[in-house]
A protein has these predicted regions:
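A short, Lys/Arg-rich alpha-helix, primarily the initiator
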Residues: 2-29, 120
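Residues within the helices of the helix-turn-helix
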Residues: 23, 34, 64
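Residues in the recognition helix of alpha-helical DNA-binding motifs
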Residues: 25, 39, 50, 80-83
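The alpha-helix within a helix-turn-helix
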Residues: 26, 37, 67
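Short alpha-helical DNA-recognition segment
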Residues: 30-49
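Short, basic-rich loop-to-helix N-cap that marks the start of a DNA-contacting helix
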Residues: 54-68
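Short amphipathic recognition helices of helix-turn-helix/homeodomain-type DNA-binding modules
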Residues: 61, 74-100
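C-terminal regulatory/oligomerization modules of transcriptional regulators
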Residues: 108-139
Length: 139
C-alpha cells in the first residue's frame, strides 16, 4: 500500500471509505471482484486495490460503470458517487450553480438563522417534495 504523505493522505483516506462501500455493495450483489470487474470493464486487480483502499477513488466514468454493473438503486448510486468525491446525479445534471439549489444551501448554512428555523425550513422542503417523492423522509 502507498504510504500516505501530507499530499496523498486525505485522498487515500477517502479511498478507504469508497473501497469499504464498494465492497459492501459488491457483496450485497453477490458478485466476486472478478465478475464485477468484467461487468464494469476494468481490471480485477484494480477492483481489489479499490476495495482495500490502496487507490484513490476513481474518476466518475469508472464509478458510473461500477454502479451499472452493481445495478445500484439511485440512492446507493449517489452514495457511491459521493464517496468517490463526485456530485450526486441530480446535482451533476442540474449543475452546482443552479440558483435555487444555491439559495436553499445558503439558507441552510446561514448560522445567523436560528437552528430551529433552519430545521423547520428543511421540513417545509421535505413536505413539498412529498408531492413527487412520496418516500421522502421528513427531518
Amino acid at each position: 500500500m502507498e504510504h500516505p504523505t501530507p499530499e496523498t493522505g486525505d485522498r487515500l483516506a477517502s479511498g478507504e471509505a469508497f473501497g469499504a462501500l464498494l465492497q459492501s455493495f459488491r457483496r450485497r450483489a453477490g458478485l466476486s471482484q472478478g465478475t464485477l470487474a468484467k461487468l464494469a470493464g476494468i481490471d480485477p486487480s484494480y477492483v481489489n486495490r479499490l476495495e482495500r483502499g490502496e487507490r484513490e477513488p476513481p474518476k466518475r466514468e469508472i464509478v458510473e460503470a461500477l454502479i451499472t454493473a452493481l445495478q445500484l438503486p439511485p440512492d446507493d448510486a449517489d452514495r457511491l458517487l459521493v464517496a468517490a468525491g463526485h456530485l450526486p446525479r441530480a446535482l451533476q445534471h442540474l449543475g452546482p450553480l443552479d440558483p435555487t439549489l444555491l439559495l436553499v444551501a445558503d439558507i441552510l448554512a446561514d448560522e445567523r438563522i436560528p437552528a430551529e428555523e433552519r430545521r423547520q425550513f428543511r421540513q417545509q422542503i421535505a413536505l413539498a417534495a412529498l408531492r413527487w417523492r412520496p418516500q421522502t423522509p421528513i427531518p
